[in-house]
Regions:
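Histidine-centered catalytic micro-motifs
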Residues: 82-89, 159-167
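Extended active-site neighborhood of metal-dependent phosphoesterases/phosphodiesterases
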Residues: 1-82, 96, 100-117, 152-155, ...
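Extracytoplasmic/secreted envelope proteins and their assembly/folding machinery
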Residues: 68, 143-147
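Active-site-flanking ligand-binding surface segments in enzyme catalytic domains
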Residues: 140-144, 170-171
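Small/polar loops that bind or transfer phosphate-bearing groups
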Residues: 55, 138, 162
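Functionally important transmembrane alpha-helices
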Residues: 148-163
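Low-complexity, serine/threonine/proline-enriched polar segments
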Residues: 104-142
Length: 192
C-alpha cells in the first residue's frame, strides 16, 4: 500500500534513441515505458483531497486532440483542477526572461539567442530560433486550441511544469499561476 497517491507525468527524456522528437518517435517506445507506470503517462487524472490533478504529456511541445477531449471530460467533474506537464506554457514575461535575460536569472549564457523551450510560443517570436528548434516547437492548431481552453477554463487553479531547470511563478491568466520548478524545488501549494 502506498502512503501517498501517485500520478506521474511524462518527461521529455523518458523515451530512448535519437530521432525527430514527435508523437511517432514517442510511440516507438511508449508501450515499453508505460509498463513502469500505473497511470497512462500521456494523460491521466487523480482526485486528491477534492482537487483533480491532471497529468498531460506535452514533452514535445504539442498537445493532441484526444488530450483536449480528455481535459474537457475531466472538467465535467466540476472539481478544481491542477494541471501537471513537463514543458511550461508560453507566458510573455517568462519567455522574455528565459530568452533574453538568461544570465540575470542564473541560467548559463548562450553564444547565440536561444529558444525558450516553452509550449505555444507565437510563431512571430520564433524568428531567432534555429531551424530545428523552430520546426520542433511551432505549435499546431490542436495545441493552440488546447492552450486557449486551459486559459479559459474557470476550474483550473494552477499549472505545474518544469523542463527549463529554473524556478519561476508566472501568471498564466489573472487567476491561474503557472509554477515552474527546477529539479531541486519542493513546493507546498494550497488549492482553493
Amino acid at each position: 500500500m502506498r502512503l501517498f497517491p501517485q500520478l506521474f507525468c511524462q518527461l521529455t527524456h523518458l523515451y530512448v534513441g535519437e530521432a525527430w522528437e514527435d508523437a511517432a518517435y514517442r510511440n516507438q517506445s511508449l508501450a515499453q515505458v508505460q509498463e513502469s507506470f500505473d497511470n497512462d503517462i500521456r494523460m491521466s487524472s487523480r482526485v486528491i483531497g477534492g482537487v483533480n490533478f491532471i497529468a498531460l504529456d506535452n514533452g514535445y511541445y504539442l498537445f493532441e486532440e484526444d488530450q483536449l477531449a480528455f481535459l474537457q471530460s475531466e472538467a465535467e467533474k466540476g472539481l478544481p483542477m491542477v494541471l501537471m506537464m513537463h514543458n511550461p506554457l508560453y507566458e510573455k514575461e517568462f519567455y522574455e526572461q528565459i530568452t533574453y535575460h538568461r544570465e540575470q536569472i542564473g541560467l548559463r549564457p548562450s553564444s547565440n539567442l536561444p529558444c525558450a523551450y516553452l509550449t505555444g510560443v507565437p510563431a512571430e517570436l520564433m524568428g531567432h530560433y534555429d531551424d530545428h528548434r523552430r520546426r520542433q516547437q511551432t505549435p499546431d492548431e490542436v495545441t493552440l486550441r488546447t492552450i486557449e481552453w486551459i486559459r479559459s477554463c474557470p476550474l483550473i487553479r494552477a499549472v505545474l511544469a518544469g523542463h527549463v531547470h529554473y524556478s519561476h511563478v508566472a501568471k498564466l491568466t489573472e487567476d491561474v499561476p503557472q509554477i515552474i520548478t527546477s529539479v531541486t524545488d519542493v513546493r507546498v501549494i494550497t488549492v482553493t
